[in-house]
Amino acid sequence: MTKPIITFNNVSKTFEDSGTQVLKNINFDLEEGKFYTLLGASGSGKSTILNIMAGLLDASSGDIYLDGERINDLPINKRDIHTVFQNYALFPHMTVFENVAFALKLKKVDKKEIAKRVKETLKMVQLEGYENRSIQKLSGGQRQRVAIARAIINQPRVVLLDEPLSALDLKLRTEMQYELRELQQRLGITFVFVTHDQEEALAMSDWVFVMNEGEIVQSGTPVDIYDEPINHFVANFIGESNIINGTMIEDYLVSFNGKEFESVDGGMRPNEPVEVVIRPEDLQITLPEEGKLQVKVDTQLFRGVHYEIIAYDELGNEWMIHSTRKAIEGEVIGLDFTPEDLHIMRLNETEEEFDARIEEYVEMDEPEDGLINAIEEERNEENL
């Protein structure tokens, strides 16, 4: 890892008036030029971390570093960090130009330089020609672009974004995800994004921190977080999951529903109680006699791209299946899956223990060398 641009070292926060501890020994290093997301439900502590970075809140204990310099006592205006707030915090009585130029005017930058940089920045956020437009006459998406332009015009080392997409409708929110990600990559500025939306975090981030009750439960790439959740909370919080109690018979062999199945997980004690995760999209519907499990369809909903089917096995376990095929309520179907579709979770495993075990024991698929090569490989395997 290169020298971190931001470091949190054992940072905790307790509100003195209520005695509530909202952050518990937070530790992380952020690299320059990456897109990071703090993901968690309301009250998980994610916005508190953002406010401590910005200097809006003081940490109760621990150290915060910006580019190697301890900044716990550094005033907000001395930190090379800019924040985009949820409500955008724009000046309603000013034009787009005046809002974006505000920070440059405070620094007494030359007027010609201000005009040049405002024009360049508005072009970056697709608001070229909006300089004289009143803020009050802009749409929600346009206001958000103004807030982002104001945050990046000084080319800060870090931009903090506190749920800036939450007020937008679904279509515009999706468009802005692409725009934000592309803008961050083009500028090379470190973005720290706060959201409760799992899909948003997975789609935009280089690295995700999953938070719960003031702690970082798991951190990793979006693919790692989704495919290898550390515990029940993460598996449930990130996407949809079928979570079944099981027993790890030995390395790469797990038992649940009274049957034994091959897996790609290891590094656990023989006959250790575990939880088994199978994502709904990884379950294939087949004939009852051909399935590894048999379930009875209870209900289904059409979700546009797939049917969401709820079924129950003979032990009463609920199964969610995503399928492009429509089922019939009351019919018995078979469920098939591969060893790679099973993810085994130990009970009460720390992130350090989890990472070490995954690296040593879990058999990971080799990365695909593009879609075309992957399709050709599949066809070659079918022809063997």
Curated annotation (Swiss-Prot):
It comes from the Bacteria. Coiled coil: none annotated. The keyword NAD does not apply. Its EC number is 7.6.2.11. Pfam families: ABC_tran (PF00005), TOBE_2 (PF08402). Keywords: ATP-binding, Cell membrane, Membrane, Nucleotide-binding, Translocase, Transport. One of its GO terms (molecular function) is ABC-type polyamine transporter activity. It catalyses: ATP + H2O + polyamine-[polyamine-binding protein]Side 1 = ADP + phosphate + polyamineSide 2 + [polyamine-binding protein]Side 1. One of its GO terms (cellular component) is ATP-binding cassette (ABC) transporter complex. It is found in: Cell membrane. ATP binds at G40, A41, S42, G43, S44, G45, K46, S47. It is a peripheral membrane protein. Gene3D superfamilies: 2.40.50.100, P-loop containing nucleotide triphosphate hydrolases. The complex is composed of two ATP-binding proteins (PotA), two transmembrane proteins (PotB and PotC) and a solute-binding protein (PotD). Part of the ABC transporter complex PotABCD involved in spermidine/putrescine import. Responsible for energy coupling to the transport system. Belongs to the ABC transporter superfamily. Spermidine/putrescine importer (TC 3.A.1.11.1) family. This is Spermidine/putrescine import ATP-binding protein PotA. It comes from Streptococcus pyogenes serotype M3 (strain ATCC BAA-595 / MGAS315). The gene is potA.
